[in-house]
Amino acid sequence: MFKIKFLRGMPLGLLIPCLLIAFVAISPVIHLTIRSLGADESTWLWFLRWKTLEIVWRSMILAISVTIVCISISVPISFLTNKTDIKFKQLWKISAILPLVIPSYIGAYLFVSVLGPKGILYQILNTLFNINSIPNLYGFTGSLIIISLLSYPYLLLTLNATINNTDNSEEESARILGLGNYNIFRKVTLPQLIPSILSGGLLVSLYTLSDFGAVSLLRYKTLTWAIFNQYSGSIDRNATALLALSLCILAITFVYFESTLRTKRKQYRASPGVAKRHKIHKLGIWQIPAIIFCGAIVFLSLIMPVSMLVFWIIRGLLHNETIPGMLEASINSLSLGVMTAILVIILATPISYLSVRYPRFISMLIEKICYAGFSLPSIAISIALVFIGSRIGSPLYQSMALLVIAC
């Protein structure tokens, strides 16, 4: 039987399905590349202009800034709720994760309703103190604040999983050598959290790059905004493909950058092997500032938008307002979520088994391709699958199956 040397005993019955899955994952990039290469000279001249570079720069700066802010929020909350005696610890630990369930578009709309130029805060200040204007929430600043408040739980989840498994013996050794709590955190605890910060930061940056709802509502021009406008306002689909491909390249660049940083850094042991109880740090006089910090983040990211949403619901019910199609939309959303979860489990299981059981070059390549597929912004995948689906036609085009594949 003919055997390819680099396969080295890998079962073809497992390898072939994994190759097909990897091909499907990377097919949007392949299609966008082919479509972009088919663009004429005028389309390329339109694309290779200063305005495009400016939009790419704005997207990149927003993603980096949001990641930095999320790190500044998540690291203190994770440390406070896992390694200190902060009051209401479980309350902060649970409530700090919940902003993850608020979609960015809805969250941005709620924030604008409260903090916008004509929002509730303005109306209160105008009535009580005759203040005629408040700082503008639109643009980069508003996008940075709102996306950071809604996406920091991605990083917080990875940090919580790691900080509970850090090697406590190193902290004890540092304490015996005379280091204080601050130096122990900076020299011992924080280096053990760096891999989680990098991976969580990557999730946040990819989420920011792919976000369309918040930036469109806040009028901040990013690549997702440009792609949507080009797709809806022009018949030149090659120009849309060029913008979508540039967004994919930017996302893959972030993935490569994170992988490079992770490889170059020293690796620290995160688990001591034998479970040891972590030392709980006494906050003392810092108890109140810690509670204020956690409370402020939870209030801004969860309580304020949810309260505004509940207020609207109650006001609508009091005025006998109805939402047509609410039940059907809810069923469709639930069905889509369940089907997508089942499909993800089915597709991820053979790839995980292949990469762990047969750690070869080909299995690692398949795994990286699937990671790259995950890193692609949703609007770029949507554009590519619309192109592919329109070529295939019925029954795939505009079907639930195509939507599940995209998700």
Describe the predicted segments one by one.
Residues 6-39, 50-164, 192-212, 240-259, ...:
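Membrane-water interface segments at the C-terminal ends of transmembrane alpha-helices
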Residues 45, 125, 167, 183, ...:
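Feature of multi-pass inner-membrane transport and sensor proteins
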Residues 45-46, 162-163, 187, 216-217, ...:
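Short alpha-helical segment immediately N-terminal to, or the first helix within
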Residues 170, 237:
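Helix-turn-helix DNA-binding elements, focusing on the entry/boundary residues of the two helices
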Residues 177-179, 191:
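Glycine/proline-centered hinge or cleavage motifs at structural transition points of membrane proteins
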Residues 209-235:
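Glycine-rich helix-loop "coupling/hinge" segments at transmembrane-helix boundaries
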